[in-house]
C-alpha cells in the first residue's frame, strides 16, 4: 500500500494541498481537500456567550471564497497551474440544541453544521495541469459534536468572562467524485475539538478567542482526474489555529470590531 501525506496550505472550505511541485508530472498530481466544516476566522463577537436555557437554535452563514493560485508547502505558486480561478460559494446551516442537563456547572448540548457548496474552477487553456472540479451545488461534509457551555461569570452586575468547550467530528458525508480533483467533500474523517473564551474588560469592550485543533484521518479513496496507482492513500497533516475577535459597542446592541485567525500546521 502506498501512502502519501500532504500539507494543508490554505484556509477555506476547499484547500488544495498538493504534493506536486514544478517537476511533478501531471499524471501524478493528487489533491487533498481540507475538511469543509472547519472555521478559519469565521468566529464572530461574543463567541463564548450563547443560549443557556433548553431549546433549539438555527443559524445560517454565507461565505464566498476565491483562489487565484495553488501553492506548494513553502507557500510558493506552483507554475504548472496557469491563470488559476477557483471559486466556492457556501451556505452554512447550523443547528444548536441546548439540553436541560448540566455537568460541572455547565450546560450540555449538541451542534451540527450542514454546508451547501457551489464550486467552480478554471485554468488557462495552455496550462500544463488543469484540475477538474465537481461543479455545481452539492452538500459538503457535515460537522457535528457535543459541547459544554458555562454560564458567564458575573462581576459588578454584568458578565465579565464566559467559556465553552466542544468536540466536533467532520464526517465525509458530502458530494465526492473520485474522478474529480476538487470536491465539496474531503473524502475523509476529521476531529476538531476547540475551546472558546470571551472576556469583557469593560461594559463596552469585548475580546474573544477560539483555540482549535484538527486531526485528519487517512483517505483510502483519494480523488484525482488522473489514474492513481492501486492502494494509494492520502492524509492531510494535523493543525492548530486560533480565531480571535475584538469589538467595541458604538450603539446599544451594536458592536464594531475586527476578527481574524492564526493557523499553524504541526505535521505534514
In which residue ranges do the predicted regions lie?
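Cleavable N-terminal export/targeting peptides
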Residues: 1-35
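Residues on the lipid-exposed face of transmembrane beta-strands in outer-membrane beta-barrel proteins
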Residues: 47-48, 60, 92-99, 144-150, ...
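Transmembrane beta-barrel strands of outer-membrane/channel proteins
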Residues: 36, 56-66, 110-116, 163-171, ...
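Surface-exposed strand-loop-strand hairpins of Gram-negative outer-membrane beta-barrel proteins
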Residues: 30-36, 64-90, 125, 130-134, ...
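Short loop/turn motifs that connect adjacent beta-strands in outer-membrane beta-barrel proteins
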Residues: 31-32, 46-55, 67, 100-108, ...
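Outer membrane beta-barrel transmembrane domains
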Residues: 34, 63, 77-79, 221-268
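Transmembrane beta-barrel architecture of outer-membrane proteins
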Residues: 43, 55, 86-94, 139-145, ...
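Outer-membrane pore/translocation modules
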Residues: 106-109, 115-235
Amino acid at each position: 500500500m502506498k501512502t502519501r501525506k500532504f500539507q494543508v496550505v490554505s484556509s477555506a472550505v476547499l484547500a488544495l494541498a498538493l504534493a506536486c511541485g514544478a517537476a511533478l508530472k501531471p499524471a501524478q498530481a493528487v489533491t487533498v481537500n481540507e475538511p469543509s466544516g472547519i472555521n478559519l476566522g469565521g468566529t464572530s463577537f461574543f463567541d463564548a456567550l450563547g443560549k443557556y436555557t433548553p431549546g433549539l437554535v438555527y443559524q445560517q452563514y454565507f461565505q464566498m471564497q476565491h483562489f487565484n493560485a495553488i501553492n506548494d508547502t513553502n507557500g510558493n505558486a506552483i507554475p504548472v497551474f496557469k491563470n488559476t480561478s477557483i471559486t466556492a460559494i457556501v451556505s452554512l446551516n447550523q443547528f444548536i440544541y441546548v439540553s436541560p442537563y448540566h455537568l460541572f456547572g455547565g450546560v450540555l448540548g449538541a451542534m451540527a453544521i450542514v454546508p451547501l457548496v457551489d464550486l467552480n474552477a478554471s485554468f488557462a487553456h495552455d496550462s500544463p495541469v488543469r484540475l477538474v472540479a465537481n461543479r455545481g451545488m452539492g452538500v459538503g461534509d457535515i460537522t457535528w459534536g457535543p459541547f459544554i457551555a458555562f454560564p458567564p461569570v458575573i462581576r459588578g452586575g454584568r458578565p465579565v468572562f464566559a467559556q465553552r468547550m466542544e468536540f466536533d467530528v467532520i464526517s465525509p458525508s458530502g458530494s465526492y467524485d473520485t474522478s474529480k480533483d476538487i470536491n465539496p467533500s474531503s473524502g475523509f474523517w476529521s476531529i476538531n475539538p476547540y475551546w472558546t473564551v470571551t472576556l469583557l474588560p469593560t461594559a463596552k469592550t469585548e475580546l474573544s478567542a477560539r483555540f482549535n485543533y484538527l486531526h485528519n484521518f487517512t483517505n483510502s479513496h483519494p480523488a484525482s482526474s488522473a489514474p492513481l496507482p492501486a492502494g494509494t492513500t492520502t492524509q492531510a497533516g494535523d493543525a492548530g489555529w486560533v480565531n480571535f475577535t475584538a469589538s467595541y459597542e458604538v450603539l446599544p446592541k451594536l458592536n464594531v470590531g475586527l476578527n481574524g485567525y492564526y493557523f499553524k500546521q504541526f505535521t505534514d
